[in-house]
């Protein structure tokens, strides 16, 4: 069963949280178009080479997606991206650095005026307001700040949980909120 067949997602994503959310959407039948940086793409491509020369995390979170390389720092690429969103996207997902999506004209405020009914999901470690809104976040940092590493490892050498639990939880939360 593919309840999201006919839905198109355009995503600017990297690492785990957003790719995990959009993988879930792809698994439900959505067409997911992942926009990647030229030359390197998603940095998760370089985590390891366990799956036929590809990074296991990348394969795990990016199956069933299409990939488009665009250097969104250039005006022409921004025009291509905006045309793709306005003509094709039902949903836009991003986990860029704080403020980057707004600078690219990809905020909900901007996109909803251009395309009423579009769903925009911004994934960040600290949300859009509050004292940490402009800070980047990573799984280990969030696990540490939440006190999780204090209950793993030993008192002398606390350690991160094996999987990226904060990123996976953020991705699952994003996925369920998109569906809501």
Functional labels for PLM-detected ranges:
Residues 1-180:
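N-terminal helix-loop segment corresponding to the beta1-alpha1 unit
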């Amino acid at each position: 069963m593919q309840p999201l067949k006919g839905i198109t997602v355009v995503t600017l994503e990297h690492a785990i949280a957003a790719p995990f959310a959009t993988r879930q959407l792809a698994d439900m039948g959505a067409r997911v178009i992942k926009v990647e940086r030229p030359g390197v793409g998603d940095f998760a491509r370089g985590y390891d080479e366990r799956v036929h020369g590809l990074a296991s995390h990348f394969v795990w979170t990016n199956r069933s997606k299409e990939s488009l390389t665009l250097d969104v720092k250039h005006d022409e690429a921004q025009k291509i991206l905006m045309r793709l969103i306005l003509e094709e996207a039902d949903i836009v997902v991003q986990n860029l650095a704080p403020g980057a999506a707004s600078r690219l004209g990809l905020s909900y405020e901007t996109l909803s005026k251009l395309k009423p009914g579009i769903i925009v999901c911004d994934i960040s470690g600290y949300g859009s307001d509050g004292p940490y809104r402009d800070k980047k976040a990573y799984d280990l940092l969030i696990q540490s700040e939440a006190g999780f590493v204090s209950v793993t490892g030993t008192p002398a050498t606390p350690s991160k949980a094996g999987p990226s639990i904060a990123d996976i939880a953020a991705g699952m939360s994003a996925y369920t909120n998109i569906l809501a």
